Amino acid sequence: MPLSTATLHILLALASEDRHGYGIMREVARQSDGRYKLGPGTLYDNLQKLLDQGIVEERSPRSLGDDPRRRYYRLSRFGRGLLATEIARLEGVVREARLHIKIRPERA
């Protein structure tokens, strides 16, 4: 089943490093060039579901000087596999769309 837009962005934000909630929101905005904004309610509702499903794990604060109330999240092994599967699915969708509407990939 396809991932929701919010879930996909959260997993992409966690793919490169562990992040706290605000860090996830900033990374989502950066990766999408500001086109997708993830609010706190959407973020934390989704994070709780991802934690419950074993897709994301909580970890201890990054360093001793870090605010102990700050919670850091990371992709689980299962979450990394799920993200890879979703990326492959989306690549297939784009490939199929290009065949049907005859769009050529842009060249840099």
Feature map (PLM): residue ranges:
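Beta-hairpin "wing" of winged helix-turn-helix
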Residues: 51-68, 74
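Amphipathic alpha-helical dimerization/coiled-coil segments
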Residues: 78-108
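Residue-level signal for threonine
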Residues: 4, 75-76
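N-terminal helix-turn-helix DNA-binding core of bacterial DNA-binding proteins
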Residues: 1-42
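Short, well-ordered turn and helix-capping elements at secondary-structure junctions
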Residues: 28, 32, 60-62, 77-79
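Basic amphipathic alpha-helical segments that dock to polyanions
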Residues: 43-50
